[in-house]
């Protein structure tokens, strides 16, 4: 009950053969012991809180009848059902268009403050990380290689991989009338079955030794 999760693709995370109401009622009845009517009342309240248009109407609909943004709001409502202390959001905006992404990010920040919960946000989008995070853990090949404040990551990155990651961001600035060539980190991510000894970034590191 203390940990909930929002998945990357809400359309595939929701059960296609169950109504929205059935899916949001289940955790309330199973974990909170609510009656069917109590679960419906609380479920509708949660759907209203996450900004789903016309919750009463959506209650009896199936996931395929909702847009991606609406499905993600349903997933967020389900995640909040048991009042978690920690909400894990795994790439929650990747499958959404840019306008809806902004709305969902704003909603998550708002809900985090209202519910007083911790938010663990997993993303490859550095722009989103800059907006959402207080502290950042950078992972490479399944290993955390740097952990610090979000400001320090962008202003004073310490690990070579973090530096390369920031350097590889697309730039629109031009030099002598030409755009800069997009930087990439040479080499490939190692297989998790054949990891190098010591630092996992060693084979791709521009400053070995």
Give short role names for the model-derived ranges.
Residues 81-85:
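A short, proline-enriched helix->beta-strand linker immediately N-terminal to the Walker B motif
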Residues 135, 147:
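Short, glycine/charged-rich "phosphate-handling" switch motifs in NTP-dependent
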């Amino acid at each position: 009950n203390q940990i909930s999760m929002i998945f990357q693709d809400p359309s595939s995370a929701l059960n296609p053969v169950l109504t929205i109401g059935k899916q949001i009622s289940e955790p309330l009845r199973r974990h909170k012991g609510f009656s069917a009517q109590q679960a419906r009342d609380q479920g509708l309240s949660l759907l209203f809180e996450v900004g789903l248009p016309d919750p009463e109407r959506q209650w009896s609909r199936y996931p395929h009848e909702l847009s991606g943004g609406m499905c993600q709001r349903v997933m967020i409502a389900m995640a909040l059902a048991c009042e978690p202390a920690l909400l894990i959001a795994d790439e929650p905006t990747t499958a959404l268009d840019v306008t809806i992404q902004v709305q969902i990010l704003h909603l998550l920040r708002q809900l985090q403050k209202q519910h007083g919960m911790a938010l663990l946000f997993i993303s490859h989008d550095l722009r989103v990380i800059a907006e959402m995070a207080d502290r950042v853990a950078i992972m490479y090949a399944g290993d955390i290689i740097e952990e610090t404040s979000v400001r320090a990551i962008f202003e004073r990155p310490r690990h070579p991989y973090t530096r390369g990651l920031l350097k590889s961001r697309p730039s629109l600035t031009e030099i002598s009338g030409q755009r800069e060539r997009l930087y990439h980190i040479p080499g490939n991510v190692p297989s998790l079955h054949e990891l190098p000894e010591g630092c996992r970034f060693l084979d791709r590191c521009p400053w070995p030794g």
